[in-house]
Swiss-Prot record:
Cellular compartments annotated: Cytoplasm
Protein name: Peptide chain release factor 1
InterPro entries in alphabetical order: PCRF, Pep_chain_release_fac_I, Pep_chain_release_fac_I_sf, Prokaryotic/Mito_RF, RF-1
Pfam families for the chain: PCRF, RF-1
Residue numbers of N5-methylglutamine PTMs: Q234
PANTHER family linked: LD18447P (PTHR43804:SF7)
GO cellular component: cytoplasm
Function description: Peptide chain release factor 1 directs the termination of translation in response to the peptide chain termination codons UAG and UAA.
SUPFAM superfamilies: Release factor
């Protein structure tokens, strides 16, 4: 099955090369760009295939030599080389399997992250702030740019909700598996008896969708303006600069009050709405795809409990891949890769099986 899919993918290269020779194709920039992207992707697979075939050939040659070799010292050298070649073969197979997975067209997109406090009152809001800080520190390590779109702060400095954007290379690809319920176990600063409390916050990672990528009918929108308010309901603006947009067909409501001008708040609210509508349509497609197999692991379902942060034990556990690390302090300082890398590999392995690769 693996080799069949590999050969099937690389066999399309010649057909695409013929398409690219069509002079009329350049006139349609959108179509041309799409074909170039597919060609680059298939070329990447083909390069790995050539490398893989070379390794297979070397393995076969070494096995043949080993059968004929009489000297024990040479036999040991050949055996060691075969071990090294087998390791390279396994690594290449894994790389090729990743490339053969159905491509997520959003992997190269920037993202909008929404963090909302869940069960746990003020402690949940403080944890939402901790998660926001964690993603900001991770973004700084990756040299990504961040911008707050909207937030609703509590009196103790927590967030009932915060929405922010991250821009950079492969942002969605790296963080798309963060969607879900994040649970925290710790003694809250608000707890005088020193009892351990469990709280939660919900994270949604949405690809940033351009205006040209989704059609939104102005007639389907109800736009309300109101005065923006700060923590505890204090008014921070004397003009009606805050904007609330309701998408009537779906009932999706977005709001923004972070900017000083109504126009900018509307632009930011529309940015969130595009991302939410895209997610709404995409989730419907996912349900259809998975209707014949109850498998939604790593799907980005925001109701799925994905991770527990246990502060007294300095422990972080990801429930989707049964990964546990005792490096919670470093993790909260933005060192996410020691968990994200093995998590991504595990979730991809699960996808290999479900896609029969």
């Amino acid at each position: 099955m693996f080799l069949e899919k590999l050969n099937s993918a690389t066999s399309k290269i010649k057909l695409i090369e013929e398409k690219l020779q069509d002079i009329n194709l350049i006139k349609n920039q959108k179509k041309y760009s799409k074909i170039i992207k597919e060609y680059t992707y298939l070329e990447k697979i083909n390069t790995k295939k050539i490398e893989y075939e070379k390794i297979l050939s070397q393995i076969n040659d070494n096995k043949t030599i080993l059968e004929k070799e009489d000297q024990q010292e040479m036999k040991e050298l050949i055996k060691q080389e075969l071990i090294d070649l087998d390791k390279k073969k396994e690594d290449l197979e894994h790389q090729i399997k990743i490339l053969l997975l159905p491509q997520d067209e959003n992997d190269s997109k920037n993202i909008i992250i929404e963090i909302r406090a869940g069960t746990g009152g003020e402690e949940a809001a403080l944890f939402a702030n901790n998660l926001y800080s964690m993603y900001i520190k991770y973004s700084e390590r990756k040299k990504w740019k961040t911008e707050i779109i909207n937030f609703n702060e509590t009196e103790l400095g927590g967030f009932k909700e915060i929405v922010f954007e991250i821009k950079g290379k492969d942002v969605f690809k790296k963080l798309k598996y963060e969607s879900g319920v994040h649970r925290v176990q710790r003694i809250p600063i608000t707890e005088s008896n020193g009892r351990l409390q469990t709280s939660a916050a919900t994270v949604a990672v949405l690809p940033n969708i351009e205006e040209t990528e989704i059609d939104i009918n102005e007639k389907d929108l109800r736009i309300d303006v109101y005065r923006s308010s700060g923590a505890g309901g204090q008014h921070v603006n004397t003009t009606d600069s805050a904007v609330r947009i309701t998408h009537l067909p779906t009932g999706i409501v977005v709001q923004c009050q972070n900017e000083r001008s109504q126009h900018k708040n509307k632009d930011q609210a529309m940015k969130i709405l595009r991302a939410r509508l895209y997610e709404f349509e995409d989730s419907k497609k996912q349900e259809q795809r998975s209707s014949n197999r109850k498998q939604q692991v790593g799907s980005g379902d925001r109701s799925e409990r994905i991770r527990t942060y246990n502060f007294p034990q300095n422990r972080i556990t990801d429930h989707r891949a049964n990964i546990t690390l005792y490096k919670l302090e470093e993790f909260m300082q933005g060192e996410l890769d020691p968990l994200l890398d093995p998590l991504t590999i595990e979730l991809q392995e699960q996808k290999f099986k479900s896609n029969n690769i």
